[in-house]
C-alpha cells in the first residue's frame, strides 16, 4: 500500500521531517516515490514551519495513498 508519511532528517536534537510518498513496506527513512513537502518543528521567527505541495498530495490521495495520522493533522494545519 502507498502511504504518505514523515521521514526524519536533520541532525541530533534538531529534527527536520520530509513528507514522503512511499510503499508502506519500506523503512521510515528509506526509499520513497516522491517528496511532497516538509515539516520543521524547530522553526523560529520568519522560518517556514511547514510546506505542502497540495496539488501533488491530492494526486496521490486520489490514487489511493493513505496519509498517516500526523501528516493528516499537519495538512489540516497548513490549509
Swiss-Prot record:
GO cellular component, alphabetical, reads: cytoplasm; small ribosomal subunit
A Pfam family this chain is assigned to: Ribosomal_S16
Per the record, the domain of life is Bacteria
Which GO molecular function annotation, any one, does this entry have? Answer: structural constituent of ribosome
Q: By its UniProt entry, which SUPFAM superfamilies does this protein fall under?
A: Ribosomal protein S16 (SSF54565)
Q: Which GO terms describe its biological process?
A: translation
Query: Keywords, A to Z?
Result: Ribonucleoprotein, Ribosomal protein
Question: Known InterPro entries for this protein?
Answer: Ribosomal_bS16, Ribosomal_bS16_dom_sf
**Similarity section:** Belongs to the bacterial ribosomal protein bS16 family.
What name has this protein been given in UniProt?
A: Small ribosomal subunit protein bS16
